[in-house]
A protein has these predicted regions:
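Pepsin/retropepsin-fold aspartyl endopeptidases
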Residues: 1-155
Length: 155
């Protein structure tokens, strides 16, 4: 099974990205998420900006006392696991929909709640981290010179 990826520019370099659908049934909200597949990130996250743009109150889907301190983009953030029920679906190269849910899906909020902290957290992309790759036994193929990338799980 292969999940096709796109190769896009991020911070001056080519990176692999995957698009998936994330649904929050309680809110009747569906998000089309473009996530950076980041082998340098331990955690899978959904961008604060994407949640806010769809009208999801972030404080209502997290426990404010349960967070992990994390460095991303040179700044410290608080990573909150999403407690609200959600579903994630990907499209395979054969146009089949598959459900691959992370063990935890985080949203990153600023460590220092000031204007700069919020701006930095708002600018972070959604990320598919190593936790997701391990949990679903996925391998990443990435050839930036040919603009080719995919996630693959041997069946």
């Amino acid at each position: 099974m292969k999940i096709p990826l796109k190769v896009e520019k991020l911070h001056g370099g080519l990176k692999p990205f995957v698009t998936f659908i994330c649904e929050f049934p309680r809110y009747h909200k569906r998000l089309f998420v473009n996530a950076f597949v980041d082998t340098g990130s331990n955690h899978t996250s959904i961008a604060l900006s994407q949640l806010l743009k769809r009208g999801i109150n972030v404080k209502s889907i997290i426990d404010e006392n349960d967070f992990t301190e994390i460095m991303i983009g040179g700044a410290k953030h608080k990573g909150y696991p999403i407690k609200e029920r959600f579903d994630i679906r990907f499209l395979t190269q054969n146009n089949k929909t598959i459900h691959l849910k992370p063990e935890k899906l985080y949203v990153y909020l600023p460590y220092h709640e000031n204007k700069e902290g919020w701006a930095m957290s708002y600018s972070l992309p959604s990320i598919i981290g190593v936790d997701f790759l391990i949990h679903h036994n996925l391998s990443l193929y990435f050839n930036p010179s040919k603009q080719m990338a995919w996630l693959e799980r041997e069946e």
